[in-house]
A protein has these predicted regions:
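Conserved acetyl-CoA-binding loop-helix of GNAT-fold acetyltransferases
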Residues: 104, 110-123, 146, 150
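Conserved N-terminal entry element of GNAT/NAT acetyltransferase domains
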Residues: 2-29, 168-169
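Short coil/turn motifs at secondary-structure junctions
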Residues: 87-89, 107, 140-142, 167
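Conserved active-site alpha-helix within GNAT-family acetyltransferase domains
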Residues: 115, 139-158, 164
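Acetyl-CoA-dependent GNAT
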Residues: 22-94, 100, 119-120, 124, ...
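Residue-level recognition of the GNAT/N-acetyltransferase active site
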Residues: 100, 105, 138
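Conserved GNAT acetyl-CoA-binding A-motif
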Residues: 125-136
Length: 169
């Protein structure tokens, strides 16, 4: 997929431009450190080797779509990423995309990185004729909730979601 130049916030436009690209296996070593930080943010142990293997499997099997935000002039730095998984709706008979992971590097926050990643994901969802995108976040993550709402996500008032943990005995 071609990259799309995206200006950061208006204060930084003169000195900083980012692009959003779809990740491939060649980006694996760039994504992994940020993916590890994402896992740590949610209280998980880093497991860099397992994290890399997980991402490699998703990319190799084409089981997810990962978008990367990168500085326009630097192919060695990732500002943020989002990972989407395909699903389907039996009721609407259409595709659904699950925005499962999104993370922005600490030094790239407040530059609209998450906003641009999600807008790219939304365009991909439209291009694949999806009926909707779904996202979940912790109840207390008000920053993420505001970002999601700013691009059009609405809290689901119709369905209550449940989780069934599967023990690994």
């Amino acid at each position: 997929m071609p990259s799309c130049p995206v200006p950061a916030n208006t204060d930084d436009i003169a000195r900083f431009v980012m692009r959003i690209i779809q990740a491939s296996l060649e980006h694996l070593d760039l994504i992994t450190p940020l993916f590890v930080k994402y896992r740590e943010f949610y209280g998980e142990l880093p497991f860099p080797d397992s994290s890399r293997a997980f991402l490699e499997k998703r990319l190799r099997r084409k089981e997810s779509v990962i978008y990367l935000a990168m500085p326009d002039n630097d192919d060695t730095k990732v500002l943020g990423f989002c990972q989407l998984y395909p699903s389907f709706s039996s009721l609407s008979l259409k595709r659904v995309w699950i925005l499962n992971d999104i993370y922005v590097a600490e030094d790239a926050r407040r530059m609209l990185v998450a906003d641009h990643l999600m807008r790219t994901a939304k365009k991909m969802a439209k291009d694949t004729q999806a009926v909707r995108m779904r996202v979940s976040t912790s109840s207390g993550n008000e920053v993420a909730q505001k970002v999601y709402e700013s691009i059009g996500f609405r809290e689901d008032a119709e369905f209550k979601n449940y989780v069934l943990p599967i023990a690994s005995d």
